[in-house]
Amino acid sequence: MKPIHKSAKLSNVLYDVRGPIVDAAKQMEDEGQKIIKLNIGNMAPFGFDAPEEVQQDMIRNLPNSAGYSDSKGIFAARKAVMHYTQQLGIAGVTLDDIYLGNGASELIVMATNALLDDGDELLVPSPDYPLWTAATSLSGGKPVHYECREDDGWMPDLADMRAKIGPRTRGIVVINPNNPTGALYSTELLKGIVQIAR
């Protein structure tokens, strides 16, 4: 059988939460250490279940879930998101602006594919949720990391962010609350990022 070789597009893609970290954890388990696996964000094994109301809504709507929804997502869910943005005082968000997906992973890949041409840059926090860097590379873009230093509570360094914007910058990734650091950004900091983006 002819060997199958991976695409050269993967040469700059790292996704440690499914590779080296898992391998190191397996080795530690083999050595008798107890490992709590939080690498992929699956909290259900640790008792973080969906609220009862959500579970009941899922059960009640199961008969309606045997087919595809609208390509932008379920209407009622999109409408709930729109109402939430209105409650926050965010003007101008319509149903046509809201797209839902099967978790963040699908939407991250869709967003980078839709946004980036070959060679375009996307500012990504460091440390980052690794799918952003991987998806940016796979989309033909270049991830440019801005600093979020531990000695500053993992907050984004706005001066560093501003300095890294160039002619090929297409966007700034903001993960709030941050994954993997858990940092929660203030409204003032977020407004500062918006000013840089403008």
Regions found by a protein language model. Name each.
Residues 114-136:
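Conserved PLP-anchoring active-site segment centered on the Schiff-base-forming lysine
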Residues 92-98, 118-121, 168:
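Short acidic capping loops at alpha-helix termini that bridge into adjacent secondary structure
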Residues 11-103, 110:
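N-terminal small-domain helix-loop-helix segment of the aminotransferase-like
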Residues 138-144:
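A short helix-loop-beta submotif of the ANL/AMP-binding
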Residues 21, 25, 132, 193:
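Aromatic/hydrophobic pocket-lining residues that form π-stacking "cages" and hydrophobic walls in ligand
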